[in-house]
Regions:
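Short active-site segment of divalent metal-dependent hydrolases/proteases
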Residues: 18, 42, 91, 119, ...
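Active-site-proximal segments of metal-dependent phosphoesterases and phosphodiesterases across multiple
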Residues: 63-108, 140-143
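Short, solvent-exposed aromatic-acidic interface loops
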Residues: 162-169
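Short, solvent-exposed coil/turn elements at secondary-structure transition points
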Residues: 16, 61, 90-92, 138, ...
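Hydrophobic anchor at the start of a short beta-strand
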Residues: 55, 84, 162
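Conserved beta-sheet core of the metallophosphoesterase superfamily
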Residues: 56, 95-158
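N-terminal active-site segment of His-dependent metallophosphoesterases
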Residues: 2-55, 63-81, 145-148, 154
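Active-site neighborhood of phospho(di)ester-bond hydrolases with catalytic His/Asp-centered motifs
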Residues: 12-14, 33-39, 56-61, 86-88, ...
Length: 169
C-alpha cells in the first residue's frame, strides 16, 4: 500500500508572553497546524490559536498552572513521517540544555524545536542528523529588537520551504 504524503504547512511561534497580534492569524492562515514552543503567557492566547488551527504546544518557564495543565513540558510526536520534539528550554546544537540532552542523544527526533532565548536560530545538527529551530519571540516582552515567527512545510518526513516572518514593532 502506497502511503501518500500529506505535505503539512506548519506555523511555528514562541514566547508570545500573553501578547496577541492579528498578524499571527494572517501569516498562519495557509498553515495546517500551529505549534507554540512555550511562554504562551495566557490561556486566552492558547485558546485563540487553538480555535484558529489544530494547535500543539508546550509550557514555558513563565507559564502558570492553568497553561501547565493544558500542555506538557515536552511534546514528542510524529507527523507526516517526521518525529518532532518541542521543549521550551532546550538550547541548540553544540549547547543543548542539560534537561533535554539525554533524550536527544538517546533518541534524536528529526526536528527539535525550542524557544526561551528570544533568538531566532535554524541550525542543522550533523552529529544527530536533526534540524533545530528556535522561532525567536513573537511577543513584546524581552530584549529582542525584532519579533519573529517561522513557517515551513513537512513533506514525507522532509522539511522544506522554511520562511522567517518578521513582525513590526
Amino acid at each position: 500500500e502506497i502511503k501518500e504524503s500529506v505535505m503539512l504547512k506548519i506555523g511555528l511561534l514562541s514566547d508570545t508572553h500573553a501578547w496577541w497580534d492579528d498578524k499571527y492569524a494572517e501569516y498562519f492562515s495557509e498553515c495546517d497546524e500551529i505549534w507554540h514552543a512555550g511562554d504562551i503567557g495566557s490561556v486566552e492566547i492558547a485558546e485563540k490559536l487553538a480555535a484558529f488551527r489544530p494547535f500543539r504546544a508546550v509550557y514555558g518557564n513563565i507559564d502558570g498552572q492553568e497553561i501547565r495543565k493544558m500542555f506538557p513540558q515536552v511534546n514528542r510526536f510524529t507527523v507526516d513521517g517526521a518525529e518532532v520534539l518541542i521543549k521550551h528550554i532546550g538550547g541548540y546544537p553544540g549547547k543543548y540544555d542539560p534537561s533535554i540532552i539525554g533524550s536527544l542523544m538517546t533518541r534524536p527526533p528529526k526536528l527539535f524545536i525550542s524557544g526561551h532565548s528570544h533568538i531566532l536560530k535554524v541550525k542543522y545538527d550533523k552529529t544527530l542528523d536533526m534540524l533545530h529551530i528556535n522561532p525567536g519571540a513573537a511577543g513584546m516582552s524581552g530584549f529582542h529588537k525584532v519579533r519573529t515567527m517561522v513557517r515551513f512545510v513537512i513533506d514525507n518526513g522532509a522539511f522544506k520551504d522554511l520562511e522567517v516572518i518578521e513582525l513590526a514593532g
